[in-house]
Protein backbone atom coordinates (compact mmCIF):
# COMPACT_ATOMS: atom_id res chain seq x y z
CA UNK A 1 0.00 0.00 0.00
CA UNK A 2 1.25 3.49 -0.90
CA UNK A 3 0.13 7.01 -0.06
CA UNK A 4 -1.13 8.70 -3.21
CA UNK A 5 -2.67 12.03 -2.17
CA UNK A 6 -3.07 14.41 0.78
CA UNK A 7 -5.92 16.93 0.80
CA UNK A 8 -6.71 19.61 3.38
CA UNK A 9 -10.05 21.27 4.13
CA UNK A 10 -10.32 24.44 6.20
CA UNK A 11 -13.71 24.44 7.91
CA UNK A 12 -15.88 26.48 10.24
CA UNK A 13 -15.75 27.25 13.05
CA UNK A 14 -11.91 27.18 13.23
CA UNK A 15 -10.92 23.67 12.19
CA UNK A 16 -8.98 21.96 9.43
CA UNK A 17 -9.40 18.35 8.32
CA UNK A 18 -6.88 16.32 6.36
CA UNK A 19 -7.48 13.30 4.15
CA UNK A 20 -4.79 10.81 3.16
CA UNK A 21 -5.61 8.55 0.21
CA UNK A 22 -3.89 5.30 -0.74
CA UNK A 23 -3.56 3.21 -3.89
CA UNK A 24 -5.77 0.52 -2.32
CA UNK A 25 -8.66 2.86 -1.65
CA UNK A 26 -8.25 3.08 2.13
CA UNK A 27 -8.58 6.65 3.39
CA UNK A 28 -7.47 8.19 6.68
CA UNK A 29 -8.62 11.42 8.31
CA UNK A 30 -6.75 13.79 10.63
CA UNK A 31 -7.20 17.23 12.14
CA UNK A 32 -4.08 19.42 11.92
CA UNK A 33 -4.68 23.01 13.00
CA UNK A 34 -3.53 25.89 15.14
CA UNK A 35 -6.54 28.00 15.94
CA UNK A 36 -6.03 31.28 14.09
CA UNK A 37 -3.16 29.92 11.97
CA UNK A 38 -4.95 27.33 9.82
CA UNK A 39 -3.46 28.56 6.53
CA UNK A 40 0.05 28.42 7.96
CA UNK A 41 -0.42 24.84 9.18
CA UNK A 42 -1.99 23.97 5.83
CA UNK A 43 1.16 25.14 4.05
CA UNK A 44 3.28 23.03 6.42
CA UNK A 45 1.15 19.94 5.72
CA UNK A 46 1.71 20.27 2.00
CA UNK A 47 5.44 20.81 2.48
CA UNK A 48 5.61 17.61 4.54
CA UNK A 49 3.63 15.72 1.90
CA UNK A 50 6.80 15.48 -0.19
CA UNK A 51 8.09 13.00 2.42
CA UNK A 52 4.86 10.98 2.32
CA UNK A 53 3.64 10.51 -1.24
CA UNK A 54 4.61 7.04 -2.46
CA UNK A 55 5.43 5.78 1.04
CA UNK A 56 3.91 2.88 2.98
CA UNK A 57 1.35 4.38 5.44
CA UNK A 58 1.75 1.47 7.85
CA UNK A 59 5.26 2.66 8.80
CA UNK A 60 3.89 5.29 11.15
CA UNK A 61 6.92 5.47 13.43
CA UNK A 62 9.37 5.89 10.57
CA UNK A 63 7.22 8.48 8.79
CA UNK A 64 6.85 10.41 12.05
CA UNK A 65 10.62 10.51 12.54
CA UNK A 66 11.15 11.56 8.92
CA UNK A 67 8.69 14.44 9.25
CA UNK A 68 10.27 15.53 12.53
CA UNK A 69 13.97 14.99 11.84
CA UNK A 70 14.42 15.41 8.09
CA UNK A 71 14.25 19.18 8.40
CA UNK A 72 17.09 20.94 10.21
CA UNK A 73 14.56 23.19 12.00
CA UNK A 74 11.87 21.34 13.91
CA UNK A 75 9.27 21.52 16.64
CA UNK A 76 7.01 24.41 17.49
CA UNK A 77 3.26 24.87 17.05
CA UNK A 78 3.06 24.92 13.26
CA UNK A 79 5.22 21.95 12.32
CA UNK A 80 4.04 19.79 15.23
CA UNK A 81 0.40 20.51 14.40
CA UNK A 82 0.99 19.53 10.79
CA UNK A 83 2.66 16.30 11.93
CA UNK A 84 -0.19 15.70 14.40
CA UNK A 85 -2.93 15.67 11.77
CA UNK A 86 -0.92 13.48 9.43
CA UNK A 87 -0.15 11.07 12.26
CA UNK A 88 -3.85 10.80 13.18
CA UNK A 89 -4.71 9.96 9.58
CA UNK A 90 -2.00 7.30 9.40
CA UNK A 91 -3.38 5.60 12.52
CA UNK A 92 -6.85 5.82 10.99
CA UNK A 93 -5.59 3.98 7.91
CA UNK A 94 -3.78 1.33 9.95
CA UNK A 95 -6.87 0.59 12.01
CA UNK A 96 -9.06 0.32 8.93
CA UNK A 97 -6.61 -2.04 7.22
CA UNK A 98 -6.41 -4.26 10.32
CA UNK A 99 -10.14 -3.88 11.09
CA UNK A 100 -9.52 -2.70 14.65
CA UNK A 101 -9.94 0.54 16.62
CA UNK A 102 -6.71 2.39 17.34
CA UNK A 103 -6.89 1.66 21.07
CA UNK A 104 -6.85 -2.05 20.25
CA UNK A 105 -3.65 -1.60 18.24
CA UNK A 106 -2.06 0.15 21.23
CA UNK A 107 -2.56 -2.74 23.65
CA UNK A 108 -6.24 -2.59 24.49
CA UNK A 109 -8.42 -0.84 27.01
CA UNK A 110 -7.20 0.23 30.43
CA UNK A 111 -10.69 1.54 31.37
CA UNK A 112 -14.28 1.22 30.19
CA UNK A 113 -15.24 4.91 30.21
CA UNK A 114 -13.67 8.36 30.60
CA UNK A 115 -15.14 11.41 32.32
CA UNK A 116 -15.84 14.36 30.00
CA UNK A 117 -16.05 17.98 31.02
CA UNK A 118 -17.71 20.92 29.32
CA UNK A 119 -16.53 24.49 28.88
CA UNK A 120 -18.93 27.15 30.19
CA UNK A 121 -18.86 30.70 28.84
CA UNK A 122 -20.38 33.90 30.17
CA UNK A 123 -19.15 37.29 31.33
CA UNK A 124 -21.41 37.50 34.38
CA UNK A 125 -21.80 35.01 37.24
CA UNK A 126 -25.52 34.62 36.51
CA UNK A 127 -24.77 33.67 32.90
CA UNK A 128 -22.22 31.07 33.98
CA UNK A 129 -24.63 29.62 36.53
CA UNK A 130 -27.39 29.38 33.91
CA UNK A 131 -24.97 27.67 31.53
CA UNK A 132 -24.02 25.10 34.15
CA UNK A 133 -27.68 24.40 34.90
CA UNK A 134 -28.36 23.74 31.21
CA UNK A 135 -25.38 21.41 30.87
CA UNK A 136 -26.29 19.51 34.03
CA UNK A 137 -29.60 18.65 32.40
CA UNK A 138 -27.75 16.69 29.70
CA UNK A 139 -25.52 14.84 32.15
CA UNK A 140 -22.44 16.97 32.83
CA UNK A 141 -21.20 17.49 36.37
CA UNK A 142 -17.67 18.67 35.58
CA UNK A 143 -16.89 21.99 33.91
CA UNK A 144 -14.21 24.49 32.97
CA UNK A 145 -14.60 28.26 32.92
CA UNK A 146 -12.39 31.28 32.56
CA UNK A 147 -10.68 32.14 35.81
CA UNK A 148 -10.51 35.84 34.99
CA UNK A 149 -10.67 38.46 32.28
CA UNK A 150 -7.52 40.31 31.23
CA UNK A 151 -5.27 41.29 34.13
CA UNK A 152 -2.46 43.79 34.20
CA UNK A 153 1.04 42.68 35.12
CA UNK A 154 0.25 44.17 38.53
CA UNK A 155 -3.48 44.78 38.83
CA UNK A 156 -5.78 46.22 41.46
CA UNK A 157 -7.89 44.53 44.11
CA UNK A 158 -11.09 45.24 42.18
CA UNK A 159 -9.95 42.99 39.33
CA UNK A 160 -9.06 40.23 41.77
CA UNK A 161 -12.36 40.60 43.61
CA UNK A 162 -14.31 40.37 40.34
CA UNK A 163 -12.65 37.06 39.43
CA UNK A 164 -13.10 35.60 42.91
CA UNK A 165 -16.72 36.76 43.14
CA UNK A 166 -17.70 34.74 40.07
CA UNK A 167 -16.15 31.58 41.47
CA UNK A 168 -17.68 32.16 44.90
CA UNK A 169 -21.16 32.51 43.45
CA UNK A 170 -20.78 29.32 41.42
CA UNK A 171 -19.66 27.31 44.45
CA UNK A 172 -22.48 28.81 46.53
CA UNK A 173 -25.05 27.95 43.83
CA UNK A 174 -24.02 24.30 43.41
CA UNK A 175 -22.04 23.32 46.48
CA UNK A 176 -20.18 20.06 45.95
CA UNK A 177 -22.67 18.81 43.34
CA UNK A 178 -20.32 19.91 40.57
CA UNK A 179 -16.59 20.20 39.97
CA UNK A 180 -14.96 22.92 37.91
CA UNK A 181 -11.53 23.86 36.68
CA UNK A 182 -10.47 27.47 36.17
CA UNK A 183 -8.59 28.46 33.02
CA UNK A 184 -6.24 31.40 33.52
CA UNK A 185 -5.45 31.07 29.78
CA UNK A 186 -1.96 32.45 30.29
CA UNK A 187 -3.53 35.87 30.93
CA UNK A 188 -2.02 36.24 34.37
CA UNK A 189 1.49 37.33 35.27
CA UNK A 190 3.39 35.35 37.88
CA UNK A 191 2.91 37.99 40.62
CA UNK A 192 -0.84 38.18 39.99
CA UNK A 193 -1.12 34.39 39.72
CA UNK A 194 0.18 34.14 43.29
CA UNK A 195 -2.48 36.56 44.50
CA UNK A 196 -5.35 35.05 42.54
CA UNK A 197 -4.58 31.41 43.39
CA UNK A 198 -4.45 32.23 47.10
CA UNK A 199 -7.82 34.03 46.93
CA UNK A 200 -9.43 31.14 45.01
CA UNK A 201 -8.27 28.34 47.28
CA UNK A 202 -11.33 28.38 49.62
CA UNK A 203 -13.59 27.52 46.66
CA UNK A 204 -11.70 24.30 45.87
CA UNK A 205 -11.50 24.37 42.08
CA UNK A 206 -10.64 21.03 40.52
CA UNK A 207 -7.59 22.56 38.86
CA UNK A 208 -6.16 25.82 37.58
CA UNK A 209 -5.15 25.69 33.93
CA UNK A 210 -2.25 27.67 32.46
CA UNK A 211 -1.69 29.69 35.65
CA UNK A 212 1.07 31.41 33.70
CA UNK A 213 2.20 31.09 30.11
CA UNK A 214 4.27 28.08 29.11
CA UNK A 215 7.15 30.49 28.46
CA UNK A 216 7.13 31.13 32.22
CA UNK A 217 7.15 27.44 33.16
CA UNK A 218 9.86 28.02 35.76
CA UNK A 219 7.09 29.48 37.94
CA UNK A 220 5.01 26.27 37.96
CA UNK A 221 6.84 24.66 40.90
CA UNK A 222 6.90 27.98 42.77
CA UNK A 223 3.15 28.44 42.37
CA UNK A 224 2.46 24.81 43.22
CA UNK A 225 4.41 25.16 46.46
CA UNK A 226 1.98 27.80 47.73
CA UNK A 227 -1.32 26.03 46.97
CA UNK A 228 -3.22 22.79 47.34
CA UNK A 229 -5.06 23.35 44.04
CA UNK A 230 -3.70 21.09 41.26
CA UNK A 231 -2.09 23.06 38.44
CA UNK A 232 -2.62 22.04 34.81
CA UNK A 233 -0.80 23.00 31.61
CA UNK A 234 0.25 21.67 28.24
CA UNK A 235 -1.88 23.04 25.41
CA UNK A 236 1.01 25.28 24.34
CA UNK A 237 3.69 22.60 24.59
CA UNK A 238 4.33 20.71 21.40
CA UNK A 239 6.59 17.71 21.93
CA UNK A 240 7.86 15.31 24.58
CA UNK A 241 10.94 17.51 24.78
CA UNK A 242 8.83 20.48 25.91
CA UNK A 243 7.01 18.30 28.43
CA UNK A 244 10.26 16.74 29.64
CA UNK A 245 11.44 20.03 31.12
CA UNK A 246 8.13 20.65 32.87
CA UNK A 247 8.00 17.15 34.33
CA UNK A 248 11.57 17.38 35.57
CA UNK A 249 10.94 20.77 37.21
CA UNK A 250 7.70 19.64 38.87
CA UNK A 251 4.69 21.71 39.84
CA UNK A 252 2.17 20.50 37.27
CA UNK A 253 -0.30 17.83 38.41
CA UNK A 254 -2.31 17.54 35.18
CA UNK A 255 -0.71 17.48 31.72
CA UNK A 256 -2.90 18.70 28.85
CA UNK A 257 -1.23 17.85 25.54
CA UNK A 258 -3.35 18.65 22.49
CA UNK A 259 -3.59 15.73 20.06
CA UNK A 260 -3.79 18.19 17.14
CA UNK A 261 -0.84 20.31 18.30
CA UNK A 262 1.65 17.98 19.99
CA UNK A 263 2.60 15.51 17.28
CA UNK A 264 -0.56 13.43 17.23
CA UNK A 265 -1.25 10.00 18.68
CA UNK A 266 2.31 8.74 18.35
CA UNK A 267 3.84 11.61 20.31
CA UNK A 268 1.09 12.07 22.88
CA UNK A 269 1.18 8.40 23.86
CA UNK A 270 4.84 8.91 24.72
CA UNK A 271 4.00 12.07 26.65
CA UNK A 272 1.33 10.18 28.60
CA UNK A 273 3.85 7.51 29.56
CA UNK A 274 6.38 10.11 30.66
CA UNK A 275 3.73 11.78 32.83
CA UNK A 276 2.78 8.49 34.47
CA UNK A 277 6.40 7.97 35.50
CA UNK A 278 6.21 11.28 37.40
CA UNK A 279 2.79 10.48 38.94
CA UNK A 280 1.25 13.24 36.83
CA UNK A 281 -2.22 12.79 35.38
CA UNK A 282 -3.42 13.34 31.81
CA UNK A 283 -6.37 15.41 30.57
CA UNK A 284 -5.93 16.00 26.83
CA UNK A 285 -6.74 19.49 25.60
CA UNK A 286 -9.46 19.45 22.93
CA UNK A 287 -11.56 22.53 22.09
CA UNK A 288 -11.51 21.37 18.45
CA UNK A 289 -13.42 19.05 16.13
CA UNK A 290 -14.46 15.40 16.03
CA UNK A 291 -11.26 13.90 14.64
CA UNK A 292 -9.18 15.58 17.32
CA UNK A 293 -11.63 14.33 19.95
CA UNK A 294 -11.50 10.79 18.60
CA UNK A 295 -7.69 10.84 18.73
CA UNK A 296 -7.86 12.03 22.35
CA UNK A 297 -10.26 9.26 23.30
CA UNK A 298 -7.97 6.56 21.93
CA UNK A 299 -5.15 7.92 24.10
CA UNK A 300 -7.47 8.15 27.12
CA UNK A 301 -8.44 4.51 26.83
CA UNK A 302 -4.87 3.20 26.74
CA UNK A 303 -3.28 5.59 29.27
CA UNK A 304 -3.65 4.61 32.93
CA UNK A 305 -3.15 8.19 34.14
CA UNK A 306 -5.87 9.77 31.96
CA UNK A 307 -8.50 11.34 34.21
CA UNK A 308 -10.58 13.82 32.17
CA UNK A 309 -11.41 14.61 28.56
CA UNK A 310 -12.24 18.07 27.26
CA UNK A 311 -14.70 18.33 24.38
CA UNK A 312 -16.16 21.27 22.44
CA UNK A 313 -19.87 20.47 22.28
CA UNK A 314 -21.67 23.83 22.48
CA UNK A 315 -18.49 25.81 23.09
CA UNK A 316 -18.83 29.51 22.29
CA UNK A 317 -16.21 29.30 19.53
CA UNK A 318 -18.43 26.98 17.49
CA UNK A 319 -19.98 29.48 15.10
CA UNK A 320 -20.87 27.98 11.73
CA UNK A 321 -20.55 24.33 12.75
CA UNK A 322 -20.94 22.15 15.82
CA UNK A 323 -18.76 19.30 17.07
CA UNK A 324 -20.54 16.49 15.23
CA UNK A 325 -21.86 18.33 12.17
CA UNK A 326 -19.38 16.61 9.82
CA UNK A 327 -19.78 13.16 11.42
CA UNK A 328 -22.10 10.44 10.14
CA UNK A 329 -21.88 8.14 13.18
CA UNK A 330 -22.92 10.72 15.77
CA UNK A 331 -24.33 8.05 18.07
CA UNK A 332 -20.85 6.67 18.72
CA UNK A 333 -19.96 9.94 20.47
CA UNK A 334 -22.95 9.84 22.83
CA UNK A 335 -22.16 10.33 26.50
CA UNK A 336 -23.80 8.47 29.36
CA UNK A 337 -23.74 10.20 32.73
CA UNK A 338 -21.02 12.55 31.52
CA UNK A 339 -18.73 9.73 30.33
CA UNK A 340 -17.50 8.73 26.87
CA UNK A 341 -17.36 5.05 25.95
CA UNK A 342 -14.61 3.66 23.68
CA UNK A 343 -15.06 4.17 19.94
CA UNK A 344 -15.37 0.71 18.42
CA UNK A 345 -15.26 1.19 14.65
CA UNK A 346 -11.96 0.51 12.85
CA UNK A 347 -9.31 3.21 12.88
CA UNK A 348 -10.18 6.42 14.69
CA UNK A 349 -13.83 5.41 14.57
CA UNK A 350 -15.07 8.62 12.91
CA UNK A 351 -17.13 8.37 9.74
CA UNK A 352 -16.67 11.73 8.02
CA UNK A 353 -19.37 13.21 5.79
CA UNK A 354 -16.97 14.10 3.00
CA UNK A 355 -19.56 15.78 0.79
CA UNK A 356 -20.47 18.14 3.63
CA UNK A 357 -16.80 18.79 4.38
CA UNK A 358 -16.15 19.77 0.78
CA UNK A 359 -19.19 22.04 0.67
CA UNK A 360 -18.41 23.86 3.93
CA UNK A 361 -14.72 24.24 3.03
CA UNK A 362 -15.60 26.47 0.07
CA UNK A 363 -16.28 29.49 2.29
CA UNK A 364 -14.42 28.70 5.49
CA UNK A 365 -13.77 31.73 7.70
CA UNK A 366 -10.28 32.75 8.77
CA UNK A 367 -10.83 32.66 12.52
CA UNK A 368 -8.71 34.93 14.70
CA UNK A 369 -8.74 35.24 18.45
CA UNK A 370 -9.68 38.70 19.76
CA UNK A 371 -7.03 41.36 20.25
CA UNK A 372 -7.41 42.71 23.77
CA UNK A 373 -5.87 45.86 25.21
CA UNK A 374 -5.41 47.13 28.73
CA UNK A 375 -6.73 50.45 29.96
CA UNK A 376 -3.43 52.09 28.93
CA UNK A 377 -3.81 50.62 25.39
CA UNK A 378 -0.97 48.11 25.75
CA UNK A 379 -1.69 44.64 24.39
CA UNK A 380 -3.29 42.20 26.81
CA UNK A 381 -3.01 38.41 26.77
CA UNK A 382 -6.19 36.76 25.47
UniProtKB/Swiss-Prot annotation:
Catalytic activity line of the entry: D-galactonate = 2-dehydro-3-deoxy-D-galactonate + H2O
EC number, as in UniProt: 4.2.1.6
CDD domains in the record: D-galactonate_dehydratase (cd03325)
PROSITE patterns linked: MR_MLE_1 (PS00908), MR_MLE_2 (PS00909)
More about this protein: Reaction proceeds via an anti dehydration.
Co-factor note (free text): Binds 1 Mg(2+) ion per subunit.
InterPro entries: DgoD-like (IPR034593), Enolase-like_C_sf (IPR036849), Enolase-like_N (IPR029017), Enolase_C-like (IPR029065), Galactonate_deHydtase (IPR023592), Mandel_Rmase/mucon_lact_enz_CS (IPR018110), Mandelate_racemase_C (IPR013342), Mandelate_racemase_N_dom (IPR013341)
Keyword annotations: Lyase, Magnesium, Metal-binding
Site positions for Transition state stabilizer: 310
Its biological purpose: Catalyzes the dehydration of D-galactonate to 2-keto-3-deoxy-D-galactonate.
One example GO MF annotation: galactonate dehydratase activity
Pfam families hit by this protein: MR_MLE_C, MR_MLE_N
Protein name, entry field: D-galactonate dehydratase
Pathway annotation from the record: Carbohydrate acid metabolism; D-galactonate degradation; D-glyceraldehyde 3-phosphate and pyruvate from D-galactonate: step 1/3
Family, similarity comment: Belongs to the mandelate racemase/muconate lactonizing enzyme family. GalD subfamily.
Keyword Magnesium: yes
Active site: 185, 285
Site entry: Increases basicity of active site His: 258
Gene that encodes the chain: dgoD
Record-linked SUPFAM superfamilies: Enolase C-terminal domain-like (SSF51604), Enolase N-terminal domain-like (SSF54826)
Amino acid sequence: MKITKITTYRLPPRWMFLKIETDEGVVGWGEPVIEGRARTVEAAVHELSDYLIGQDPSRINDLWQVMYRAGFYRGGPILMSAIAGIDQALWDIKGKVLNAPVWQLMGGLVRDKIKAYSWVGGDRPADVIDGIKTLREIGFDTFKLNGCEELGLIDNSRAVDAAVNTVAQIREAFGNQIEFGLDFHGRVSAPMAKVLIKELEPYRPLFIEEPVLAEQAEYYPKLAAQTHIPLAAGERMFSRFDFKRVLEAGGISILQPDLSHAGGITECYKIAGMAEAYDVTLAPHCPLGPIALAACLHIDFVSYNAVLQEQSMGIHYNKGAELLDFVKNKEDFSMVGGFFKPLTKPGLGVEIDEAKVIEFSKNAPDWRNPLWRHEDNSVAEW
